[in-house]
């Protein structure tokens, strides 16, 4: 019986896991936080522009490449936004009509 006297009596403890308990919720600060956020937004816009100028270490080719990518992206968005859903469906159906019968899907039945 002496061998069992040193046994841990209680729940097992996991390493690296904080003990779970009741934690109090933090109170929200409304007015002060809003004023600070508005002030920070004004200064952050100015600082962002300055950071862009200072931290822009791209080569001219990289800058031109990104500018063209943005331009093409805008063109794609405008092209997709110009058609309505109904027009897209009609175009798709016209495309399916032009395909050969090789692409037709045969009737599939799971009962046979």
Swiss-Prot record:
Keywords: Apoptosis, Cell cycle, Nucleus. InterPro entries: FAM32A (IPR013865). It is found in: Nucleus. Widely expressed, with highest level in pancreas and lowest in muscle. The keyword Ion transport does not apply. One of its GO terms (cellular component) is nucleolus. Residues 23-56 are annotated as: Disordered. GO terms for biological process: apoptotic process. It comes from the Eukaryota. Belongs to the FAM32 family. PANTHER family: PROTEIN FAM32A (PTHR13282:SF6). This is Protein FAM32A. It comes from Mus musculus.
């Amino acid at each position: 019986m002496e061998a069992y006297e040193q046994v841990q009596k209680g729940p097992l403890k996991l390493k690296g896991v904080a003990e779970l308990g009741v934690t109090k919720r933090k109170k929200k600060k409304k007015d002060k936080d809003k004023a600070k956020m508005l002030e920070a937004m004004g200064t952050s816009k100015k600082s962002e522009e300055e950071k862009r100028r200072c931290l822009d270490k791209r080569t001219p080719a990289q800058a031109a490449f990104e500018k063209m990518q943005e331009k093409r992206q805008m063109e794609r968005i405008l092209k997709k936004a110009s058609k309505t859903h109904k027009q897209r469906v009609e175009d798709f159906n016209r495309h399916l009509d032009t395909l050969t019968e090789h692409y037709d899907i045969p009737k599939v039945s799971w009962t046979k």
